[in-house]
Structure formats: structure tokens, C-alpha cells
Swiss-Prot record:
Stored InterPro entries: Essential_protein_Yae1_N, Yae1-like
Species name: Homo sapiens (Human)
Subcellular location per the Swiss-Prot or TrEMBL entry: Cytoplasm; Nucleus
GO process annotations (BP): protein maturation
Lineage of source species: Eukaryota, Metazoa, Chordata, Craniata, Vertebrata
Keyword Cytoplasm: yes
Name of the featured protein: Protein YAE1 homolog
Length: 226
């Protein structure tokens, strides 16, 4: 807008003066007052834009974090619910203390994995996009323009890092539907007595319990979907 460009002009030392000076040219006084008002409105517009940008960014960050957390923790919640249902069934129809203790141990194992996942999610920060940040800074005229070649090189480096991160992420996916990058501490060699049992082992033990109790095949189908 033309008035924004005019308001951004820097006044020289000789342009400063009292807007109420009776001996000054009226057109010059009006121009100074107009420039002062426009500069104030530009600053107010920047402040309003920053506040609005913060609100949008916070909401987007919350939505992304909630979606990521829900995707990771959902299967653990379903598994915990299935084990809790089996525990209730055993209390009502079967007083075998061995099975009850085994289910309680599996619930504890799920809790360990959930605790690690939640702790790891809190430490995750989204990667910064160098090109976007530079463009934003240039739009605000807060620094000198960065050469195009340098921006291209930085963008290539950023894409290379993102591709490597995506490759590592894809390699860590588990067949059970749970991202193994969040549950490294849940891997184990001795499943039965490990301090950090894996989700796959918990699912196998739960399916074995379902067969041992002679429950419906639908429960096994439900476990296969986790």
C-alpha cells in the first residue's frame, strides 16, 4: 500500500519540528502529522500481526502434537484396556493366581512403555525450516538480504537432513503398528524377565492368555489389529 511505503520513509534531522508551530508551513505540518499517524499504525499492524501469528502457530503446534501423540499412544491404550478386561474376567470366572499375576505383570510392562513414550514425546521439537525463516526475516527487513546461492545451499542441506531423518524413521517402524523409535527401551532379548519388554512380546503373551482362557476368537482378531 502506498501509505505504508510513505510511512516507512525515515525523516531527516531537518524535518523534525513542532507540529503546533504557528510559523511553519501548514502543508508541511499536515504531512508530518500524517506520517506520524501512519508510522504508528504500521507499528500497531506489526504488533497485531505478531500476536495473530503466535496464536495460529500455537494452535497448529497443539494440533500436530496431539495428532502425533494420539497415533503413538493409541495402541498402548487399547492393549491396556484388553488386559484390564482379561483381568476382570479372571476375577469373575477364574481364581487362578498365576494368571492374575501374569496379567498384572503385563499391565506393568505396558505402563513402562507408555511412560517412556510420553517422556520421549515431550522432548521432541519440530525442525526449523531455514528458507522459511530467512524469508520471514527479509519480509520484516531485519537484516541484509541473503544471497540466493547461499539460500539454495542451505535449503539443500536441510532437505538432506530431513530425508535422512525420514529414512531412519521408516526403518524403525514395527509390524505391530507401534513406532519403535519411541519405544527403544521396550526392546528386550529375554522377554520373560526383561525390565523393558517389547510391545510385540506383550501382544504375544496376551494372545497366549486369551487362548489359554478359551475366550472368543474375536479377542484374538482385536489383538492382531494393534
Amino acid at each position: 500500500m502506498s501509505w505504508v511505503q510513505a510511512a516507512s520513509l525515515i525523516q531527516g534531522p531537518g524535518d523534525k519540528g513542532d507540529v503546533f508551530d504557528e510559523e511553519a508551513d501548514e502543508s508541511l505540518l499536515a504531512q508530518r502529522e500524517w506520517q506520524s499517524n501512519m508510522q504508528r499504525r504500521v507499528k500497531e499492524g506489526y504488533r497485531d500481526g505478531i500476536d495473530a501469528g503466535k496464536a495460529v502457530t500455537l494452535q497448529q503446534g497443539f494440533n500436530q502434537g496431539y495428532k502425533k501423540g494420539a497415533e503413538v499412544i493409541l495402541n498402548y491404550g487399547r492393549l491396556r484396556g484388553t488386559l484390564s478386561a482379561l483381568l476382570s474376567w479372571c476375577h469373575l470366572h477364574n481364581n487362578n493366581s498365576t494368571l492374575i499375576n501374569k496379567i498384572n505383570n503385563l499391565l506393568d510392562a505396558v505402563g513402562q512403555c507408555e511412560e517412556y513414550v510420553l517422556k520421549h514425546l515431550k522432548s521432541i521439537t519440530p525442525p526449523s525450516h531455514v528458507v522459511d525463516l530467512l524469508d520471514s526475516i527479509e519480509d520484516m527487513d531485519l537484516c541484509h538480504v541473503v544471497p540466493a546461492e547461499k539460500k539454495i545451499d542451505e535449503a539443500k542441506d536441510e532437505r538432506l537432513c530431513e530425508n535422512n531423518a525420514e529414512f531412519n524413521k521408516n526403518c524403525s517402524k514395527s509390524h505391530s503398528g507401534i513406532d519403535c523409535s519411541y519405544v527403544e527401551c521396550c526392546r528386550t532379548q529375554e522377554h520373560a524377565h526383561s525390565e523393558n519388554p517389547s510391545p510385540t512380546w506383550i501382544l504375544e503373551q496376551t494372545a497366549s492368555l486369551v487362548k489359554q482362557l478359551g475366550l472368543s476368537v474375536d479377542v484374538l482378531q482385536h489383538l492382531k489389529q494393534l
